[in-house]
């Protein structure tokens, strides 16, 4: 879609000499949620004392199971795996860490086992916990020619376990690179011959390994498949389900409050009609992603409020403001002063005021916690984001296609991931100044995540953006550099 002409003043003025403002409007899909969460009854989200007492009793039983001695260490590994996949491991972090440390320190615990399933499960759980378990443990499953043995091909459970373990590989884990290729090939070839239940597990794993599923989605899914496992324990499942429902009530309460603020305080979509009406999407993807646990409720609310304003900023730069207006807006954000409001176009004033209000709220919260330094990092992250948005707007205005390197340098910022990482620490009381310094120092792990997020976003949005004459994507920059045409 090309740029649309929109009158810059009220339509009832019919002066033909009035200039017409061209805005890069986008046709965003409407929210599928509407006022669903706003209409939630607060009483329906209350948690009964009976439920809290029951979940505590079940928690104690699961804790006893976790700490009980076992003859076969694989039983303990399977219990830990179930607890993690069911989304309740946050209750037992200390216990799980102690158990896995003992297993890591004792190489006899499955280290000499010839059971592919158990060896792979042990490896994955230890790598997830941060232990640099050597990958050459899988050499025992190779033949003299360096290929994985024929004997394991029909071990579906073992192959699937090795497949999941291979996704914990790091640079230099050549055997895990081979394992990923081998297991993927085997699973794809056997899936059509498996019973429906196992086939469904395999297809889901091939679509996305455990490491890449959001914890809440994996927990909800595993409720239905866990009973089919040989290690199924009804107490563990009942505890996980009740805990899930209790936390879900908390999440519903949070998204209800954020939705109400989105509509009533920020005025979306009635007063600010050009932005994506996506507060529920923001909550689910941006906020539950970093942390779903109940102890981070305050952090989610703080992050949600900032993310809401940042989303409006994004669409203002991307789908409404002219370059001249955006320069004024960026200048106001850099200066961060109430006095700047008067220099802004009318439609920008409420967004800028909301930005000032939320940072004032953060200042008050951080002061109470003795962590006022968090305010500085919040402002700097948003300023950096605004400057990157403005550069994109400049490229669009000039129809400039940057080099891949030039594009990625700016696009990693506009993707918002590094901003999200920084802001997610606001509501975490144990996040020190050193933590914020680390997050803002462009660490490799954050840069890698930024790169993945940006490229994935560009892959799915390029066609839509090109239709509206939008700023180029990584794909456009690469195609120009490679002098190739769209297939």
Q: Each predicted region: which residue ranges?
A:
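Terpene synthase/cyclase
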Residues: 1-487
